[in-house]
């Protein structure tokens, strides 16, 4: 009886992580982006890095780079905002690229007081709003089942290899039950070390 239960448990555990186990792996962000094929943008492209700290990253080599962070900065291209509570401080359809490196795992899935809110869903709505049509969102985040997903006590939003494809893509759109209003195509996803790299393209 105990052996049968053991194997049933193994089967359930494998089912929950098999999607991540079967994903492509790359050694670096550069290798991942190269595998995504040509990413077209205009000469005067703009990129926004969310949760950028003091140094926004620019993997798409956009001509203009902006950053948003919860901490104030003397750099004029870094704007202070708490994206768990505030909108992205840029106009609609203004960015060719939005990136988030080790950031979305810090954005709560649900807040109950004073009213029920879904900050992660709200952030994805904001990303969709600020991106230009066919713009790209690149996420780099610790992924389940790696311990990096949980070790940091400020990681409150564990991401799996299926989070984006089930809740935010233009097929299943499960996020709509929580207020997601946008739509993304999943261009590519892969594992790099203990992290999931996801490239999404805005769809209207």
PLM regions: where:
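Short, flexible/disordered intra-domain loops and linkers
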Residues: 109-120, 148-156
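Conserved N-terminal segment of class I S-adenosyl-L-methionine
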Residues: 1-93, 97
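Conserved beta-strand signature within the Rossmann-like core of class I S-adenosyl-L-methionine
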Residues: 134-141
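A short beta-strand submotif of the Rossmann-like class I SAM-dependent methyltransferase core
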Residues: 97-103, 109
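Core SAM-dependent methyltransferase catalytic element
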Residues: 184-204
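A short glycine-rich, Lys/Arg-flanked "PGG" loop and its adjoining helix->strand segment in the class I
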Residues: 117-133
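Short "lid" loop at the C-terminus of a central beta-strand within the Rossmann-like core
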Residues: 142-147
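Conserved Class I S-adenosyl-L-methionine
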Residues: 149-181
């Amino acid at each position: 009886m105990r052996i049968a239960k053991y194997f049933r448990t193994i089967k359930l555990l494998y089912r929950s992580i098999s999607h991540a186990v079967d994903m492509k792996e790359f050694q670096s962000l550069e290798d991942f982006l190269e595998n995504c094929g040509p990413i077209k943008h205009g000469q005067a492209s703009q990129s926004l890095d969310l949760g950028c700290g003091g140094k926004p990253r620019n993997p798409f080599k956009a001509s203009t780079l902006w950053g948003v962070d919860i901490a104030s900065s003397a750099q004029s291209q870094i704007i202070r905002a708490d994206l768990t509570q505030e909108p992205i401080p840029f106009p609609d359809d203004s960015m060719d690229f939005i990136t988030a490196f080790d950031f979305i795992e810090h954005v709560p899935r649900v807040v109950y007081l004073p009213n029920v809110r879904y900050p992660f869903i709200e952030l994805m709505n904001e990303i969709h709003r600020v991106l230009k049509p066919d713009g790209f969102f690149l996420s780099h985040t610790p992924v389940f089942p790696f311990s990096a997903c949980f070790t940091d006590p400020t990681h409150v939003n564990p991401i799996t290899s299926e989070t984006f494809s089930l809740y935010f893509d233009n097929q299943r759109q499960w996020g709509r039950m929580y207020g997601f209003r946008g739509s993304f195509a999943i261009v590519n996803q892969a594992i790099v070390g203990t992290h999931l790299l996801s490239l999404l393209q805005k769809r209207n």
